[in-house]
């Protein structure tokens, strides 16, 4: 069997796509948090988001990662709804 040309740490296509989904979710959460009017609330939410992503950084199980992305999207939508209500 021929040796692979790819380095051992190369992501599969599925892993690459999941990583992009996670990074997009992270960016969207931070962008939404920037809209929070109160400085202390904004800092708390930013620290919370960073800690959650940092804590789950080592997850490798496909189903677990998919579930966390779904939960993150639901929390993002909840934050967006809360901000919309606060502005109205």
UniProtKB/Swiss-Prot annotation:
Tell me which PANTHER family the record gives: LYR MOTIF-CONTAINING PROTEIN 2
Family membership, please give it: Belongs to the complex I LYR family.
Transit peptide location on this chain: 1-19
Taxonomic superkingdom: Eukaryota
Q: What is its main location?
A: mitochondrion
**Which InterPro entries does this one have?**
Complex1_LYR_dom (IPR008011), Complex1_LYR_LYRM2 (IPR045293)
Q: What does this protein do?
A: Involved in efficient integration of the N-module into mitochondrial respiratory chain complex I.
GO CC annotation: what is one?
mitochondrion
Q: Which UniProt keywords apply?
A: Mitochondrion, Transit peptide
Q: Does the keyword Transferase apply?
A: no
What is the designated name of this protein?
Answer: LYR motif-containing protein 2
List the subcellular locations.
Answer: Mitochondrion
Q: Name one GO biological process term.
A: mitochondrial respiratory chain complex I assembly
Q: What is the lineage of its organism?
A: Eukaryota, Metazoa, Chordata, Craniata, Vertebrata
Q: Which CDD domains match?
A: Complex1_LYR_LYRM2 (cd20262)
């Amino acid at each position: 069997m021929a040796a692979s040309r790819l380095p051992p740490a190369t992501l599969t296509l599925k892993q690459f796509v999941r990583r992009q989904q996670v990074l997009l979710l992270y960016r969207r959460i931070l962008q939404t948090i920037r809209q929070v009017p109160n400085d202390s609330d904004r800092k708390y939410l930013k620290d919370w988001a960073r800690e959650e992503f940092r804590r789950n950084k080592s997850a490798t199980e496909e189903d677990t990662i998919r579930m966390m992305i779904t939960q993150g999207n639901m929390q993002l939508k909840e934050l967006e709804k809360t901000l919309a209500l606060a502005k109205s």
